């Protein structure tokens, strides 16, 4: 509105200026001629008089022109003052909000390690049932052993899965006292070949490794999709596992399926690794017992894995190289999560090392200390969270057995432990089996 008023003022000034010049021109044309000299032909006969008259007219015109210049200057000055007084600041165009570019989700293949169990169908059925996207989660079944019935089961899925076969089915030369471990040698050879295919042939950036006797939870894919960026960003992590070694039903909080932890123990049994880690491990991959080899300090290098409160995998395979002993004693009791958790919508930054160490250690060592006997007899029920302190290998094993958690150690690291601390539920109470606060590292001689 103000801009229109200012423009109108300029227009009127210009009109007045033009009108004034028109009147001036009319004035000169209609101005009466001054009285002549006595002789009517005096001016015509006297050139000097004519010159004086022309000069006088020119001077009059110059004076009038100067007055017009002054008038025009006043118009300009008044316009400038008016514009300054009523000037409306020109608002800068609103800045476009910065919308972060969300990278497309990574393609994370599921590598199923198969051999001679036709029950791989149960594993594949669950994977395909819960898989949200065939493009984001291609399923690659790598088969060893040359078992034809298992091969037919895998082939029956057609293009829903990719079937690859480990070509070297020969026996492996081993020491005489290791002949009974031939199966462990073949497993290590198969893992090396299959992971090589994933990262060198298919060129994937990461992979989730699943054995053929595992059943997955409804949010299995959601869990790994959400934790993949965390694994990529945090160099203090080297894997994400779907497994809680102490995940028996009575030892987990079923009301908190979203709860995740860091652990120094390599759990396996459905785990995510990056191509960069495989590039590090492949040149020194062991000939046998690959999982225990992963748990050695030379491979772990102080790094941790992410693990859930409630397992996202469950093993149903009693048949295997361990002859079912570990399955009967422990594995079959692990609870499989059934409640879908939208992990990709949750803030998982609490799992980054600095924040996690600060908060987790404050919680553990801020909990009241209670003797193991009082925990077992459920004394001090009002204490919903307690700490049981051990001081050495023997006391750890004794307390772990008394409380029902796994008591074995691999290179000094307890199963599901973080900084020596094992967290679980006992009779509905949160218990931290922990070393003294002065703990300064694992002792690899503890086994």
From Swiss-Prot:
Places the protein is found: Golgi apparatus membrane; Cytoplasm, Perinuclear region
Keyword Iron-sulfur carried by entry: no
Membrane-related topology note: Single-pass type II membrane protein
Record topology, Lumenal segments: 30-447
Note on how the cofactor is bound: The cofactor is mostly bound to the substrate.
Record field: transmembrane: 7-29
GO cellular component term of the entry, any: perinuclear region of cytoplasm
Keyword Nucleotide-binding in annotation: no
The EC number(s) this enzyme carries: 2.4.1.101
InterPro entries according to UniProt: Glyco_trans_13 (IPR004139), Glycosyltransferase_13 (IPR052261), Nucleotide-diphossugar_trans (IPR029044)
CDD domains listed in its UniProt record: GT13_GLCNAC-TI
Disulfides per UniProt: 115-145, 239-305
GO molecular function: alpha-1,3-mannosylglycoprotein 2-beta-N-acetylglucosaminyltransferase activity; manganese ion binding; protein N-acetylglucosaminyltransferase activity
Cytoplasmic side: 1-6
Binding site for Mn(2+): 213
Record-listed substrate binding positions: 117, 144, 190, 212, 322
Pathway linked to the protein: Protein modification; protein glycosylation
Positions of the catalytic residues: 291
Record function comment: Initiates complex N-linked carbohydrate formation. Essential for the conversion of high-mannose to hybrid and complex N-glycans.
Subunit structure: Interacts with MGAT4D. Interacts with BRI3.
Protein name according to UniProt: Alpha-1,3-mannosyl-glycoprotein 2-beta-N-acetylglucosaminyltransferase
Lineage: Eukaryota, Metazoa, Chordata, Craniata, Vertebrata
Gene symbol of the encoding locus: MGAT1
